[in-house]
From Swiss-Prot:
It holds the Pfam family PurT_C. This is Formate-dependent phosphoribosylglycinamide formyltransferase. Mg(2+) binds at E265, E277. It catalyses: N(1)-(5-phospho-beta-D-ribosyl)glycinamide + formate + ATP = N(2)-formyl-N(1)-(5-phospho-beta-D-ribosyl)glycinamide + ADP + phosphate + H(+). The keyword ATP-binding applies.
Length: 391
């Protein structure tokens, strides 16, 4: 049963994180008449612009987080980012708070160590070889154990921050320093991963709902500097690889529990899949589903966590997304060239409404549907180039 937003009966959804993914979740909640409260560490974040009200605070501050939850009494708490006081969510969940998909999932996936140990050590899934390190000496030993080339990541970071590849011994000290600067909570523990020889990587959006586990068509993507630049759906895979991917994803989401969508990241080599990471929420590469599916990843997330059946996920055909990336400084961003960017049919545009920029920032995305994924990607890239950012 849902109440009516802004009334005593309101069913409240508290978003922890208010970026572009949270904005789309907020819009889907609004479609169902849910009351949306958006939180983030900075004002005028994208989801705040489509919410009923908002709070600005550091969500790693457990006491502030508890105050907001106590004030709002939400039916659902929906994390959109990792940098949250997850121990407090676990504590409040034990007292009856509904955390999406679960406080356990939010806590485990907040850092790479929890989810890697779950996948490799508890579930026995194939992953890259790995070691953890707390200091430089341990780090040097970890690199030696895993062997060069290897990938270094802070255990707590997102969007590629602090990640680098060690290609020779000369890179070791530089990689350590870069990882220490890139962690979400400052300097700290890192993971050293063996370099994987793979054909491609995918995001398998996996929905855990009241009527079972459902899979979206696999999403391929291209990364640059740790961030996705284009994504496409479906990624062509062998039947055996799809079965292996779905098996791996189902094992992971069932271990994490709760209802919602999970972005399961996998490397694929031939018919084999290697588990990489999982996000217990919509995934940035899944923005393509805004044009590729009857229900986007955001609609699926809301449908699942509110306890409604998913039934069937309908895919519309080869589709792509291309990021509109800003690089500059401004507190008054403007955009031009939209008419040129949208001159072709089956082309859509989303501008995220981010209030400012200081350096590099994802500001929007172009979405396309074509007769093949290759054509869709090319068209999305060309359209994205036509958007002019005025700083």
């Amino acid at each position: 049963m849902f109440g009516t937003a802004t009334r005593e009966s309101a069913t409240r959804v508290l978003l922890l994180g208010s970026g572009e993914l949270g904005k789309e979740v907020a819009i889907e909640c609004q479609r169902l008449g849910l009351e949306v409260i958006a939180c983030d560490r900075y004002p005028d974040a994208p989801a705040m612009q489509v919410a009923h009200r908002s709070y600005v605070f550091d969500m790693l501050d457990a006491s502030e987080l508890e105050k907001v939850i106590a004030a709002e009494q939400p039916a659902f708490v929906v994390p959109e980012i990792e940098a949250i006081a997850t121990d407090k969510l676990v504590e409040l969940e034990e007292q009856g708070l509904n955390v999406v998909p679960s406080a356990k999932a939010t806590k485990l996936t907040m850092n790479r160590e929890g989810i890697r140990r779950l996948a490799a050590e508890e579930l026995g899934l194939t992953t890259s070889p790995y070691r953890f390190a707390d200091n430089y000496q341990q780090f040097v030993e970890a690199v030696e154990a895993v062997s060069i080339p290897c990938v270094v990541k802070p255990v707590m970071s997102s969007s590629g921050k602090g990640q680098s590849v060690i290609k020779s011994p000369a890179d070791i000290e530089k990689a350590w320093q870069y990882a220490q600067e890139g962690g979400r909570t400052g300097a700290g523990r890192v993971i050293v991963e063996g370099f994987i020889d793979f054909d491609y990587e995918i995001t398998l959006l996996t929905v855990r709902a009241v009527d079972g586990v459902h899979f979206c068509a696999p999403i391929g993507h291209r990364q640059e500097d740790g961030d996705y630049r284009e994504s496409w759906q479906p990624q062509q895979m062998s039947e055996n690889a799809i079965k292996a991917a779905e098996y791996t994803a189902e094992q992971v989401v069932n271990a994490l529990g709760g209802y919602g969508i999970f972005g399961v990241e996998l490397f694929v080599k031939g018919d084999k899949v290697i588990f990489n990471e999982v996000s217990p929420r919509p995934h940035d590469t899944g923005l393509v589903t805004l044009i590729s599916q009857e229900m986007s990843e955001f609609a699926l997330h809301v449908r699942a966590f509110t306890g409604m059946p998913v039934n069937k996920i309908v895919q519309y055909g080869p589709s792509a997304s291309a990021v509109i990336l800003g690089n500059g400084q401004s507190e008054n961003l403007r955009f031009d060239g939209m008419s040129d960017a949208l001159e072709q049919p089956q082309t859509q545009l989303r501008l995220f409404g981010k209030p400012d920029i200081n350096g590099r920032r994802r500001l929007g995305v172009v979405l396309t549907r074509r007769s093949s994924t290759e054509k869709a990607v090319d068209a999305a890239i060309e359209s994205a180039k036509k958007i002019k950012i005025i700083y």
